[in-house]
């Protein structure tokens, strides 16, 4: 299990634990490890936190009306750059949709538990509000406090992948317009130095460049679209992946150093393929003119059900090098292959 946990930590970019306890439902998430005498805090309707003796009391004090999904169609928030391009693409707002919502607990004058715990959310929880809330409230009430977000809270308050609108040519040159986000320009230029990046201010939720392959994936996908083929995708980490896609199968090849545990590596690659296929074909969030997300339930994110996915086959190429992340390259390769297979339509999601 040591090597399995190490591979999981590399792919999830946070400390992960794989053991019998996990299979038995004791995964070690922050909420699972909180002391029994914790107060519970949840976001309230005014931008603060409601605190109660248990989750039910805290939610009753929050005075929030449960959100729903909207019937209003999602619209890509950024316009394409002018010019003649071999490939163009506009992406939409999407929800990271991680399994375990944000939580952290803290003792008075202590350090908060990490919301990453045993689930890294592929970078989406790195800027979570929960740890600082738990710390400040524990110091205020002089009792341990568990700060926990509902699914709706995570959608409203959590950072999103920066939407882009770009055009590129076969020679590798082009323009990508992207929601202004710290670190996003360097992420794009790390794989596409000939692409000019224009950051734009748009109304919407917070964005983050720490979310899985943000920026550099979109740049490589656009370049693949311009060439009309995927070839081999190289990640900034140095891993490589290729993918072939049709309605029935997604075939993947990945090289990412010593596998450590092929079962774990394969599972992360299958998950990355699912995330990529779903992102390209089905996912979106409606954001209103005030920048508020209107799709607030799990079923409104557009995530493709696992049973509706093409079959995913993973070939792990032999490699005795240093173990590095491979699933981000797989994510990018499958997204590019899916887009090309579906006809490189200019706006995502393209539909199934």
What is the predicted function of each stretch?
Residues 127-139:
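A glycine- and small-aliphatic-rich helix-loop capping segment at beta-alpha/alpha-beta transitions
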Residues 44, 52-53, 115, 149-151:
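Glycine-rich, histidine-containing beta strand-loop boundary motifs that form or position
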Residues 19-38, 79-110, 117:
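Conserved beta-alpha junction segments in alpha/beta enzyme cores
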Residues 55-58, 119, 182, 256:
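Short, surface-exposed beta-strand-loop junctions and turns on beta-sheet-rich folds
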Residues 1-77, 130, 159-160:
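Flexible, low-hydrophobicity surface segments
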Residues 114-127:
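Glycine/serine-rich anion-binding loops at beta->alpha junctions
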Residues 1-9, 13, 64-83, 95-98, ...:
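C-terminal catalytic domains of large/alpha subunits in multi-subunit enzymes
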Residues 59, 122, 259-261:
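Short helix/loop capping segments that flank catalytic or ligand/cofactor-binding pockets
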């Amino acid at each position: 299990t040591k090597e399995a946990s190490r591979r999981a930590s590399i792919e999830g970019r946070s400390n992960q634990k794989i053991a019998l306890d996990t299979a038995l439902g004791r995964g070690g998430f922050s909420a699972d490890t909180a002391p029994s005498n914790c107060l519970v805090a949840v976001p309230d309707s005014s931008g603060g936190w409601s605190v109660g003796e248990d989750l039910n009391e805290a939610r009753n004090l929050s005075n929030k009306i449960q959100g729903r999904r909207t019937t209003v169609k999602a619209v890509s928030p950024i316009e394409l750059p002018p010019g003649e391009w071999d490939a163009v693409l506009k992406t939409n707002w999407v929800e990271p949709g991680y399994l375990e919502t944000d939580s952290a607990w803290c003792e008075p004058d202590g350090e908060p538990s990490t919301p990453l715990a045993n689930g890294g959310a592929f970078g989406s929880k790195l800027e979570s509000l929960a740890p600082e809330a738990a710390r400040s409230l524990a110091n205020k009430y002089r009792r341990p406090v568990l700060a926990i977000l509902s699914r709706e809270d995570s959608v409203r308050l959590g950072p999103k992948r920066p939407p882009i609108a770009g055009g590129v040519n076969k020679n590798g040159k082009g323009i990508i317009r992207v929601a202004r986000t710290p670190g996003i320009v360097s992420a794009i230029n790390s794989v596409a130095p000939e692409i000019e990046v224009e950051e734009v201010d748009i109304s919407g939720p917070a964005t983050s460049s720490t979310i899985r392959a943000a920026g550099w994936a979109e740049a490589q996908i656009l370049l693949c679209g311009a060439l009309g083929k995927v070839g081999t995708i190289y990640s900034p980490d140095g891993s490589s992946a290729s993918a072939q896609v049709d309605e029935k199968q997604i075939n993947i090849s990945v090289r990412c150093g010593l596998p450590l545990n092929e079962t774990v590596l394969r599972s992360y690659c299958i998950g990355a393929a699912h995330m990529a296929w779903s992102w390209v074909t089905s996912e979106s969030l409606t954001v209103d003119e005030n920048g508020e997300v209107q799709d607030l339930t799990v079923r409104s994110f557009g995530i493709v059900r696992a049973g509706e996915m093409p079959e995913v086959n993973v070939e792990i190429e032999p490699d005795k090098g240093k173990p590095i992340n491979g699933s981000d390259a797989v994510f990018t390769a499958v997204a590019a292959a899916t887009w090309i297979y579906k006809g490189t339509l200019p706006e995502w999601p393209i539909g199934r």
